[in-house]
Amino acid sequence: MGKIIGIDLGTTNSCVAVMDGKNARVIENGEGDRTTPSIVAYAQDGEILVGQPAKRQAVTNSQNTLFAIKRLIGRRFEDAEVQRDVSIMPYKIIKADNGDAWVEARNEKMAPPQVSAEVLKKMKKTAEDYLGEPVTEAVITVPAYFNDAQRQATKDAGRIAGLDVKRIINEPTAAALAYGLDREVGNRTIAVYDLGGGTFDISIIEIDEVDGEKTYEVLSTNGDTHLGGEDFDSRLINYLVDEFKKEQGIDLRNDPLAMQRLKEAAEKAKIELSSAQQTDVNLPYVTADATGPKHLNIKVTRAKLESLVEDLVKRSMDPVKVALEDAGLKVSEVNDVILVGGQTRMPMVQKTVAEFFGKEPRKDVNPDEAVAMGAAVQGGVLAGDVKDVLLLDVTPLSLGIETMGGVMTSLIAKNTTIPTKHSQVFSTAEDNQSAVTIHVLQGERKRASDNKSLGQFNLDGIQPAPRGMPQIEVTFDIDADGILHVSAKDKNSGREQNITIKASSGLNEEEIQKMVRDAEANAEADRKFEELVQTRNQADQLVHGTRKQIEEAGDKLAANDKEAIEKALSELEIASKGEDKAAIEAKLQALVEASKPLLEIAQQQAQAGAGNTADATDAGAKKDDDVVDAEFEEVDGKDKK
């Protein structure tokens, strides 16, 4: 059985880890980095770039460079959060036929799981390069506050990338697993504050250790799936745009190229201000008008940045209070606070969390890597490599159905340990009703329409009876991934209907299979492209080497041979510019054949050279016989010895 890898599929960066003996090891990617930007770019020649290469070309290809896709996964186009992103993202967010938020690049419409699959493929390849064997199974993390639709969409992304997703695990829970892996923790209650690139989570977790066996029980979880580092960046970008407009009278929002440069500069400035009190945002030639080029140079202090994002940091504390209340704990009962996610490096975030909990957060957990490491631990548990670890996670939001009067009736309350199953009997609202619609909802509001609709199905064939008489048993079954299966059964007739709640990413099985096939076709195309490039490189080397040999041969090469070689060289150079690998290989072989006279000349020169060397050696030896050994003095400074 191969390794089950752990992947932290982040909004801004992604990370992959694997169990190496008893420890989780983060794997460096092809660029030598331990994290990979979650950025996918579609180049003009059809090439798909992922990670750092995609980030590097974003300035000149902003409309086809997709980032922060996780904020769209499993969401409807009409969602308020999506509409907010539509107005600020440089790429196109569109409404799919089924009402979901999709994206468009190079005139191709794509579902967010399709784009995320490209990042997962890079993570998969990173692991395969390190392990030296194919990887087919993974544990992928999601924000704890992701709803059912977002979890299913993440699972779909894994399938499109060619991965069998063994488990979807909550990010804070994964961080807790990493924290407890190599520590004697005893019995402790920890708070995991996870502020990443696009999402925020807080989980209160109890770790019990008995005879070396650790049980991680999530007591409660809460969060905001649209609050993260990207929002902090946006505040700083808007400030810089407004300042530049005051100085120069030009609104950079109308210039996509300038905005992309500004985005990179703002992100860099934000990071610098975590360690420095002040930084310069300096962008020469950021734009131009009739009077000439314009340069942006604005000083930003840490205090200024903090004033811009203060309300965002405060906003993150509301879910923290709710999570503690749901867990039935006082602040003083939390033993340790763990910070996860790159945005927690901001001093203001650390200070706010420390003040709330009355203790300094732990600094010995890497905020960028802990989640992937925890996912690898869970992979090890599932593979049987890691023993003595039991994980009890929870469902983040209440689940129920719409009942008479547009009310949501909960069947499973939020923070219920999963997997779990719950049944409840309902009846008809009208006399002789022959069918009922089961409308499945997720959320905490009483009004059904205020909650997230996960899907609906009909149970028909109910025998005519007065209202309230038929007995319809509705069963909710949540698996270990937090994904919901719903069934409804007419207890009188025995008729049953069930549904696995599909993500509102709306990808049906056929669409997923098509995307899987497309991904496989791309992998084949990538392999062929790589082989073509290798053949071109061979051709270039041979052309270079042959020209050098022609030069060295000089007059020794017959004119007709030289002409034949030059012709073969020219044909190979033309073939190398094409896309036909077989044609390049044929011309390579033709040049090798035509160059045989050059090989003969080189051999003759080598033999002649060897003969001359032998003569010189004999003469040297004869000369040595006449040499007299001289006496010598070793001189050190002025003293003779």
Swiss-Prot record:
GO molecular function: ATP binding; ATP-dependent protein folding chaperone; unfolded protein binding
CDD domains to which the protein is assigned, alphabetical: ASKHA_NBD_HSP70_DnaK-like (cd10234)
Regions of compositional bias (Low complexity) in chain numbering: 604-619
Pfam families: HSP70 (PF00012)
Region (Disordered): 604-641
Entries under PROSITE patterns matching the protein: HSP70_1, HSP70_2, HSP70_3
Modified residues (Phosphothreonine): T199
Entry keyword annotation includes Signal: no
InterPro entries in the cross-refs: ATPase_NBD (IPR043129), Chaperone_DnaK (IPR012725), Heat_shock_70_CS (IPR018181), HSP70_C_sf (IPR029048), HSP70_peptide-bd_sf (IPR029047), Hsp_70_fam (IPR013126)
Keyword Chaperone recorded: yes
Stated induction or repression of this protein's expression: By stress conditions e.g. heat shock.
Top-level taxon of origin: Bacteria
Keywords: ATP-binding, Chaperone, Nucleotide-binding, Phosphoprotein, Stress response
NCBIfam families on file: PRK00290.1, PRK05183.1, prok_dnaK
Similarity comment: family membership: Belongs to the heat shock protein 70 family.
UniProt function note: Acts as a chaperone.
The protein's name in its UniProt record: Chaperone protein DnaK
Organism of derivation: Proteus mirabilis (strain HI4320)
Lineage: Bacteria, Pseudomonadati, Pseudomonadota, Gammaproteobacteria, Enterobacterales
